[in-house]
Amino acid sequence: MISSYCFSLVGRDHIKNHIPCHDSSLIKAISSSWKIAVVADGVGSCKHAEIASEIAVNEVAELIKKQFPPSSSDERAYFSVIHAAMHGAANAIEVYVEENDPGNEMQYQTTLAVAIMSSKCLYYGSAGDSGIIALDDQGNYHLVTKKQNDDLGRVYSIPTNRLFEIGRANYIPVAVLCMTDGIYDTIAPVTLQNNKFPVNVPFANMFVTYALGLEKFKEPEAVESCKNSLIKYLQSDECKHMTDDMSVAALINTNSDLQPEDIKWEEPQIDFYALKWNEVSLYPSIETRNKLFKEFIREKNPEWTERQIDELLEKYSKTDASSSATDDMKKLTPDSDTKSNQDEKRNASSMPEVQLELDKEMMGKNTRGIRGFWKKRS
């Protein structure tokens, strides 16, 4: 059995400024074996972000359910359905704007993250900076998708940008969590990105472990209890640093043999000085970098002498200089990445770069018909 739940909470900043929740979330059953989890985060700078996110979650889930193959040995069929459904969600937003607010498409932008899971397989699609993590049957958490932002941190959103990341997990899933960045940035923080365990495992477990080994007759009560506990916790002072809207849609296989104690995790060793040095290194002025870094050291170690502070500054500034020299040497070295090496590096679970012929055929033949279907529903 696949246990599931979802919720969306208005963020602290939005409450303070009397702004509605821009997030939407949804769970939809395809069959007794497959379920869909989906979240969307309307872009905060858009006037009608909440409308865009609501359209996106409803349309992508409905289109996936309508077209999902009951069984297929060709994973391209699943990729094509997800790809078409994500385009469908984007097109549905455009149709809504055309009919209700012509010329204002930029006021209706949203992210979108969708997962489709059975007890054996996990397919996914993502657009923007919402995220998906999954737990496998060996007790390992995985970052399934990458956040899509430009160099200035601006999100690539739909319907304007359609840079879809679509794929299949290459492990047996036990659980999957689709999250908007209000939760994702705490479950998969930047401070852990180079760590052995890039997921905040104790926090992630709060969303998952209630269902491991859960008996079917206890499932409704357990789901409600978990959901209420999570909402209470996220709204408490323990999470006051989480100020954005928060959404999660979860799918968990209750028949898995995995137990909570089998989930792998180690206390992370984080070099906060290295993180701070990377942050201040964005400033072109050496004087500014050193000043900000020394202020940080002094704040963390008020009893330190100036000599101790200078010694630590020297350690990190030397490391930075060494890295720069290495990078310069790499630029002078011919690129040895052959096509075969590049192919090996490509994620085995990702959708192929060349658009699938099956997908082309589906989109080419059905676009007009599907677009009419969206118009009827709007």
Features from the language model and the residues they span:
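C-terminal catalytic subdomain
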Residues: 169-378
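Short hydrophobic beta-strand that contains or immediately precedes a catalytic carboxylate
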Residues: 37-40, 125, 177-179
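A contiguous pocket-lining binding segment that forms or flanks enzyme active sites
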Residues: 153-178
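Catalytic core of PPM/PP2C metal-dependent serine/threonine phosphatase domains
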Residues: 56, 72-135, 163-170, 234-243, ...
